[in-house]
Protein backbone atom coordinates (compact mmCIF):
# COMPACT_ATOMS: atom_id res chain seq x y z
CA UNK A 1 0.00 0.00 0.00
CA UNK A 2 1.51 3.34 -1.12
CA UNK A 3 1.44 5.92 1.68
CA UNK A 4 3.39 8.63 -0.15
CA UNK A 5 1.37 11.86 -0.26
CA UNK A 6 0.18 13.15 -3.59
CA UNK A 7 0.75 16.78 -4.59
CA UNK A 8 -2.87 17.57 -3.70
CA UNK A 9 -2.46 15.96 -0.28
CA UNK A 10 0.76 17.86 0.39
CA UNK A 11 -0.98 21.14 -0.43
CA UNK A 12 -3.87 20.20 1.86
CA UNK A 13 -1.46 19.37 4.70
CA UNK A 14 0.41 22.66 4.25
CA UNK A 15 -2.83 24.64 4.17
CA UNK A 16 -4.07 22.86 7.30
CA UNK A 17 -0.80 23.56 9.10
CA UNK A 18 -1.13 27.28 8.44
CA UNK A 19 -4.83 27.54 9.25
CA UNK A 20 -4.60 25.57 12.49
CA UNK A 21 -1.58 27.59 13.61
CA UNK A 22 -3.57 30.79 13.01
CA UNK A 23 -6.65 29.61 14.93
CA UNK A 24 -5.19 27.29 17.56
CA UNK A 25 -2.51 27.00 20.19
CA UNK A 26 -2.40 27.27 23.99
CA UNK A 27 -3.14 31.00 24.16
CA UNK A 28 -6.33 30.69 22.14
CA UNK A 29 -7.39 27.60 24.09
CA UNK A 30 -6.98 29.50 27.37
CA UNK A 31 -9.16 32.31 26.02
CA UNK A 32 -11.89 29.84 25.04
CA UNK A 33 -11.73 28.17 28.45
CA UNK A 34 -11.96 31.56 30.14
CA UNK A 35 -15.05 32.40 28.12
CA UNK A 36 -16.57 28.95 28.82
CA UNK A 37 -16.96 28.50 25.07
CA UNK A 38 -17.79 24.98 23.88
CA UNK A 39 -16.29 25.54 20.44
CA UNK A 40 -14.25 28.11 18.54
CA UNK A 41 -16.79 29.65 16.15
CA UNK A 42 -14.21 31.61 14.16
CA UNK A 43 -12.00 28.55 13.68
CA UNK A 44 -15.04 26.53 12.63
CA UNK A 45 -16.00 29.10 10.01
CA UNK A 46 -12.45 29.06 8.69
CA UNK A 47 -12.47 25.28 8.31
CA UNK A 48 -15.83 25.42 6.52
CA UNK A 49 -14.43 28.04 4.14
CA UNK A 50 -11.39 25.82 3.55
CA UNK A 51 -13.71 23.01 2.43
CA UNK A 52 -12.38 20.34 4.78
CA UNK A 53 -15.80 18.80 5.38
CA UNK A 54 -16.31 18.22 1.68
CA UNK A 55 -13.19 16.06 1.39
CA UNK A 56 -15.11 13.01 2.63
CA UNK A 57 -18.27 13.58 0.57
CA UNK A 58 -18.66 12.20 -2.98
CA UNK A 59 -18.71 14.66 -5.87
CA UNK A 60 -22.31 13.85 -6.81
CA UNK A 61 -23.32 15.08 -3.34
CA UNK A 62 -21.39 18.34 -3.69
CA UNK A 63 -18.13 17.17 -2.14
CA UNK A 64 -14.58 16.71 -3.37
CA UNK A 65 -14.76 12.93 -3.52
CA UNK A 66 -11.51 12.36 -1.63
CA UNK A 67 -11.35 10.31 1.57
CA UNK A 68 -10.91 10.14 5.32
CA UNK A 69 -7.15 9.83 4.75
CA UNK A 70 -7.19 13.34 3.25
CA UNK A 71 -9.29 14.76 6.08
CA UNK A 72 -6.89 13.17 8.57
CA UNK A 73 -4.13 15.46 7.31
CA UNK A 74 -6.20 18.37 8.62
CA UNK A 75 -7.33 16.54 11.76
CA UNK A 76 -3.73 15.85 12.77
CA UNK A 77 -2.97 19.57 12.64
CA UNK A 78 -6.20 20.37 14.50
CA UNK A 79 -5.06 17.99 17.23
CA UNK A 80 -1.60 19.50 17.24
CA UNK A 81 -2.99 23.00 17.82
CA UNK A 82 -5.78 21.84 20.16
CA UNK A 83 -8.55 23.38 18.06
CA UNK A 84 -11.96 23.27 19.73
CA UNK A 85 -14.03 22.44 16.65
CA UNK A 86 -16.31 19.49 15.79
CA UNK A 87 -14.47 18.69 12.56
CA UNK A 88 -14.21 14.96 13.19
CA UNK A 89 -17.79 14.67 14.41
CA UNK A 90 -19.51 16.67 11.67
CA UNK A 91 -17.33 15.17 8.92
CA UNK A 92 -18.30 11.70 10.13
CA UNK A 93 -21.96 12.66 9.93
CA UNK A 94 -21.52 14.14 6.44
CA UNK A 95 -19.81 10.98 5.22
CA UNK A 96 -22.57 8.82 6.74
CA UNK A 97 -25.42 10.85 5.28
CA UNK A 98 -23.83 10.82 1.84
CA UNK A 99 -23.60 7.03 2.02
CA UNK A 100 -27.32 6.46 2.56
CA UNK A 101 -29.03 4.50 -0.20
CA UNK A 102 -31.99 6.89 -0.24
CA UNK A 103 -29.85 9.98 -0.67
CA UNK A 104 -32.85 12.26 -1.21
CA UNK A 105 -33.71 12.15 2.51
CA UNK A 106 -30.22 13.27 3.49
CA UNK A 107 -29.62 15.70 0.62
CA UNK A 108 -30.96 18.89 2.21
CA UNK A 109 -29.27 18.31 5.55
CA UNK A 110 -26.01 17.40 3.84
CA UNK A 111 -25.98 20.61 1.83
CA UNK A 112 -26.52 22.64 5.01
CA UNK A 113 -23.69 20.74 6.71
CA UNK A 114 -21.19 21.46 3.96
CA UNK A 115 -21.90 25.19 3.93
CA UNK A 116 -21.75 25.44 7.72
CA UNK A 117 -25.42 26.27 8.25
CA UNK A 118 -25.98 23.14 10.31
CA UNK A 119 -23.91 21.58 13.11
CA UNK A 120 -24.72 17.91 13.63
CA UNK A 121 -22.54 15.99 16.11
CA UNK A 122 -22.54 12.21 15.94
CA UNK A 123 -24.32 10.23 18.63
CA UNK A 124 -24.25 6.84 16.93
CA UNK A 125 -21.05 5.91 18.77
CA UNK A 126 -23.30 5.08 21.70
CA UNK A 127 -25.00 2.39 19.67
CA UNK A 128 -22.27 -0.12 19.13
CA UNK A 129 -19.18 0.75 21.15
CA UNK A 130 -19.98 0.16 24.78
CA UNK A 131 -23.70 0.55 25.38
CA UNK A 132 -23.73 4.20 26.39
CA UNK A 133 -27.32 4.53 25.18
CA UNK A 134 -29.66 3.90 28.10
CA UNK A 135 -33.11 2.64 27.12
CA UNK A 136 -33.09 4.39 23.74
CA UNK A 137 -36.20 3.26 21.89
CA UNK A 138 -37.91 4.18 18.63
CA UNK A 139 -41.62 3.47 18.27
CA UNK A 140 -42.03 2.74 14.56
CA UNK A 141 -45.82 3.07 14.62
CA UNK A 142 -45.96 6.39 16.45
CA UNK A 143 -42.68 7.68 15.04
CA UNK A 144 -41.42 8.85 18.44
CA UNK A 145 -38.07 8.44 20.16
CA UNK A 146 -37.48 7.94 23.90
CA UNK A 147 -34.36 7.49 26.01
CA UNK A 148 -30.98 9.03 26.71
CA UNK A 149 -27.55 9.22 25.13
CA UNK A 150 -24.51 10.35 27.12
CA UNK A 151 -21.02 11.64 26.32
CA UNK A 152 -21.93 13.52 23.15
CA UNK A 153 -19.20 15.94 22.05
CA UNK A 154 -20.28 19.50 21.13
CA UNK A 155 -23.89 18.73 22.01
CA UNK A 156 -24.50 22.24 23.32
CA UNK A 157 -23.68 23.77 19.92
CA UNK A 158 -25.73 21.35 17.84
CA UNK A 159 -28.64 22.22 15.58
CA UNK A 160 -29.54 18.54 15.15
CA UNK A 161 -28.23 15.07 15.99
CA UNK A 162 -27.67 11.98 13.91
CA UNK A 163 -29.14 9.27 16.12
CA UNK A 164 -28.84 5.51 15.74
CA UNK A 165 -31.30 3.24 17.52
CA UNK A 166 -31.02 -0.52 17.62
CA UNK A 167 -33.73 -1.29 20.13
CA UNK A 168 -37.13 -2.20 18.71
CA UNK A 169 -38.14 -4.13 15.59
CA UNK A 170 -35.23 -2.88 13.46
CA UNK A 171 -32.34 -0.40 13.58
CA UNK A 172 -33.01 3.21 12.61
CA UNK A 173 -30.68 6.05 11.68
CA UNK A 174 -32.38 9.45 11.85
CA UNK A 175 -31.60 13.16 11.80
CA UNK A 176 -33.33 14.66 14.85
CA UNK A 177 -33.60 18.40 15.39
CA UNK A 178 -32.00 19.70 18.57
CA UNK A 179 -34.96 21.90 19.53
CA UNK A 180 -36.92 18.76 20.44
CA UNK A 181 -34.22 17.35 22.73
CA UNK A 182 -33.20 18.17 26.29
CA UNK A 183 -29.43 18.76 26.35
CA UNK A 184 -27.46 18.80 29.62
CA UNK A 185 -23.83 19.83 29.13
CA UNK A 186 -20.89 19.43 31.51
CA UNK A 187 -17.29 20.61 31.18
CA UNK A 188 -14.39 18.21 30.75
CA UNK A 189 -10.97 18.68 32.28
CA UNK A 190 -9.58 20.33 29.13
CA UNK A 191 -12.41 22.84 28.70
CA UNK A 192 -14.29 20.79 26.12
CA UNK A 193 -17.77 19.51 26.93
CA UNK A 194 -19.82 16.34 27.05
CA UNK A 195 -23.58 16.38 26.74
CA UNK A 196 -26.35 14.09 27.86
CA UNK A 197 -29.31 14.01 25.49
CA UNK A 198 -32.79 13.16 26.73
CA UNK A 199 -35.50 12.22 24.26
CA UNK A 200 -39.04 12.32 25.68
CA UNK A 201 -41.60 11.33 23.07
CA UNK A 202 -39.63 13.20 20.42
CA UNK A 203 -41.47 12.95 17.11
CA UNK A 204 -39.27 11.83 14.21
CA UNK A 205 -41.04 12.34 10.86
CA UNK A 206 -40.50 9.80 8.10
CA UNK A 207 -38.43 12.26 6.05
CA UNK A 208 -35.93 12.52 8.94
CA UNK A 209 -35.17 8.78 8.86
CA UNK A 210 -31.95 8.37 6.87
CA UNK A 211 -31.80 4.57 6.89
CA UNK A 212 -33.39 1.52 8.48
CA UNK A 213 -32.60 -2.15 8.98
CA UNK A 214 -29.28 -3.59 7.84
CA UNK A 215 -28.35 -0.37 6.05
CA UNK A 216 -28.75 1.66 9.25
CA UNK A 217 -26.60 -0.81 11.17
CA UNK A 218 -23.88 -0.73 8.49
CA UNK A 219 -23.81 3.07 8.32
CA UNK A 220 -23.68 3.43 12.11
CA UNK A 221 -20.77 1.00 12.38
CA UNK A 222 -18.91 2.91 9.67
CA UNK A 223 -19.66 6.14 11.52
CA UNK A 224 -18.22 4.75 14.74
CA UNK A 225 -15.04 3.66 12.99
CA UNK A 226 -14.69 7.08 11.36
CA UNK A 227 -14.98 8.76 14.77
CA UNK A 228 -12.38 6.44 16.31
CA UNK A 229 -9.88 7.00 13.51
CA UNK A 230 -10.42 10.76 13.53
CA UNK A 231 -9.88 11.02 17.28
CA UNK A 232 -6.80 8.81 17.00
CA UNK A 233 -5.08 11.00 14.43
CA UNK A 234 -5.91 14.09 16.51
CA UNK A 235 -4.18 12.39 19.44
CA UNK A 236 -1.12 11.72 17.29
CA UNK A 237 -0.89 15.41 16.43
CA UNK A 238 -1.42 16.39 20.07
CA UNK A 239 1.33 14.05 21.29
CA UNK A 240 3.75 15.34 18.64
CA UNK A 241 3.12 18.94 19.71
CA UNK A 242 3.64 18.12 23.39
CA UNK A 243 6.93 16.40 22.59
CA UNK A 244 8.12 19.38 20.51
CA UNK A 245 7.35 21.78 23.37
CA UNK A 246 9.26 19.52 25.75
CA UNK A 247 12.29 19.20 23.47
CA UNK A 248 12.52 22.98 23.24
CA UNK A 249 12.36 23.21 27.03
CA UNK A 250 15.02 20.62 27.86
CA UNK A 251 17.42 22.21 25.38
CA UNK A 252 17.22 25.48 27.32
CA UNK A 253 16.68 24.44 30.95
CA UNK A 254 20.01 24.43 32.80
CA UNK A 255 20.91 22.12 35.68
CA UNK A 256 24.38 21.38 37.05
CA UNK A 257 25.77 23.86 34.55
CA UNK A 258 24.42 22.19 31.40
CA UNK A 259 21.11 21.76 29.53
CA UNK A 260 19.03 18.96 31.05
CA UNK A 261 18.53 17.67 27.51
CA UNK A 262 22.13 16.51 27.59
CA UNK A 263 21.28 13.95 30.28
CA UNK A 264 20.91 10.48 28.82
CA UNK A 265 17.84 9.53 30.83
CA UNK A 266 15.85 12.43 29.36
CA UNK A 267 17.20 11.74 25.89
CA UNK A 268 15.96 8.17 26.14
CA UNK A 269 12.50 9.29 27.22
CA UNK A 270 12.31 11.78 24.37
CA UNK A 271 13.42 9.19 21.82
CA UNK A 272 10.88 6.69 23.12
CA UNK A 273 8.17 9.31 22.69
CA UNK A 274 9.31 10.10 19.16
CA UNK A 275 9.31 6.43 18.16
CA UNK A 276 5.84 5.93 19.64
CA UNK A 277 4.46 8.90 17.71
CA UNK A 278 5.94 7.73 14.41
CA UNK A 279 4.64 4.18 14.90
CA UNK A 280 1.17 5.42 15.79
CA UNK A 281 1.09 7.87 12.88
CA UNK A 282 2.20 5.18 10.43
CA UNK A 283 -0.38 2.70 11.71
CA UNK A 284 -3.15 5.30 11.66
CA UNK A 285 -2.55 6.41 8.08
CA UNK A 286 -2.19 2.84 6.86
CA UNK A 287 -5.54 1.91 8.38
CA UNK A 288 -7.08 5.14 7.08
CA UNK A 289 -5.99 4.25 3.56
CA UNK A 290 -7.45 0.77 3.98
CA UNK A 291 -10.67 2.27 5.39
CA UNK A 292 -11.09 4.47 2.31
CA UNK A 293 -10.49 1.45 0.07
CA UNK A 294 -12.99 -0.67 2.01
CA UNK A 295 -10.22 -3.15 2.85
CA UNK A 296 -9.75 -2.56 6.58
CA UNK A 297 -10.45 -5.00 9.40
CA UNK A 298 -12.65 -3.47 12.15
CA UNK A 299 -10.22 -4.69 14.80
CA UNK A 300 -7.46 -2.52 13.32
CA UNK A 301 -9.54 0.57 13.96
CA UNK A 302 -9.55 -0.34 17.65
CA UNK A 303 -5.81 -1.00 17.52
CA UNK A 304 -5.22 2.50 16.13
CA UNK A 305 -7.41 4.20 18.74
CA UNK A 306 -6.00 2.14 21.63
CA UNK A 307 -2.39 2.89 20.68
CA UNK A 308 -3.06 6.58 20.06
CA UNK A 309 -4.89 6.97 23.38
CA UNK A 310 -2.14 5.24 25.35
CA UNK A 311 0.64 7.03 23.47
CA UNK A 312 -0.81 10.51 23.95
CA UNK A 313 -1.28 9.96 27.68
CA UNK A 314 2.20 8.49 28.18
CA UNK A 315 3.92 11.23 26.17
CA UNK A 316 2.08 14.13 27.81
CA UNK A 317 2.71 12.66 31.28
CA UNK A 318 6.40 12.34 30.45
CA UNK A 319 6.33 15.92 29.18
CA UNK A 320 5.00 17.11 32.54
CA UNK A 321 7.72 15.24 34.39
CA UNK A 322 10.51 16.52 32.15
CA UNK A 323 9.34 20.08 32.79
CA UNK A 324 9.66 19.50 36.52
CA UNK A 325 7.46 21.23 39.08
CA UNK A 326 6.56 24.10 36.75
CA UNK A 327 4.89 21.64 34.39
CA UNK A 328 2.23 20.90 36.99
CA UNK A 329 1.18 24.52 37.39
CA UNK A 330 -1.92 25.94 35.72
CA UNK A 331 0.16 28.76 34.25
CA UNK A 332 2.43 26.54 32.13
CA UNK A 333 1.13 25.49 28.73
CA UNK A 334 2.36 21.89 28.86
CA UNK A 335 -0.46 21.02 31.25
CA UNK A 336 -3.00 21.94 28.57
CA UNK A 337 -1.68 19.15 26.36
CA UNK A 338 -2.04 16.60 29.13
CA UNK A 339 -5.59 17.69 29.95
CA UNK A 340 -6.50 17.56 26.28
CA UNK A 341 -5.04 14.06 26.04
CA UNK A 342 -7.12 12.97 29.05
CA UNK A 343 -10.36 14.10 27.42
CA UNK A 344 -9.66 13.06 23.83
CA UNK A 345 -8.19 9.65 24.70
CA UNK A 346 -11.45 8.68 26.41
CA UNK A 347 -13.68 9.93 23.60
CA UNK A 348 -15.11 7.08 21.48
CA UNK A 349 -13.37 4.51 23.65
CA UNK A 350 -10.07 4.65 25.52
CA UNK A 351 -7.26 2.11 25.56
CA UNK A 352 -9.11 -0.40 27.76
CA UNK A 353 -12.37 -0.27 25.83
CA UNK A 354 -10.67 -0.48 22.45
CA UNK A 355 -8.45 -3.34 23.58
CA UNK A 356 -11.57 -5.23 24.64
CA UNK A 357 -13.19 -4.53 21.28
CA UNK A 358 -10.04 -5.70 19.48
CA UNK A 359 -10.08 -8.93 21.46
CA UNK A 360 -13.76 -9.53 20.76
CA UNK A 361 -13.17 -9.08 17.03
CA UNK A 362 -10.08 -11.25 16.78
CA UNK A 363 -10.14 -13.98 19.44
CA UNK A 364 -12.20 -17.13 19.22
CA UNK A 365 -14.50 -17.65 22.23
CA UNK A 366 -13.18 -20.24 24.65
CA UNK A 367 -15.16 -23.43 25.05
CA UNK A 368 -16.43 -24.23 28.52
CA UNK A 369 -14.50 -26.92 30.36
CA UNK A 370 -16.34 -30.24 30.73
Give, region by region, the residue ranges found by the protein language model:
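A generic structural signal for well-ordered coil/turn residues at beta-strand boundaries
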Residues: 115-117, 132, 157-159, 170, ...
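A short core secondary-structure module
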Residues: 146-181
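Alpha-helical interface subdomain recognition
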Residues: 1-81, 103, 116, 222-370
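Flexible, small-/acidic-enriched active-site or ligand-binding loops
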Residues: 133-136, 151-152, 177-212
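N-terminal glycine-rich flavin-associated loop
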Residues: 83-103
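Short glycine/proline-enriched turns and hinge-like loops at secondary-structure junctions
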Residues: 66-67, 130-133, 154-158
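A short, Trp-centered hydrophobic/proline-enriched beta-strand micro-motif
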Residues: 115-128
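Cytochrome P450 C-terminal beta-domain/meander region
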Residues: 131-146, 295, 332
Amino acid sequence: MDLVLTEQQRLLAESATRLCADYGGPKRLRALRGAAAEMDVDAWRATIAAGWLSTVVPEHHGGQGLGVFDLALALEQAGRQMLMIPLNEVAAVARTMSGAVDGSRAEAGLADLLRGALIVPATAAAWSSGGRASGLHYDHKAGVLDGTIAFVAYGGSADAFLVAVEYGPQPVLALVRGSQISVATESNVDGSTSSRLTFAKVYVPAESVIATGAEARKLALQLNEFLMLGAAIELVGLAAAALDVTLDYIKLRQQFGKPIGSFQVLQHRAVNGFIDIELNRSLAYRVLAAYDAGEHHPAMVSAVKARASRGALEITRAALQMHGAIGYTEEHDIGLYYKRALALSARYGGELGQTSRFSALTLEPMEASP
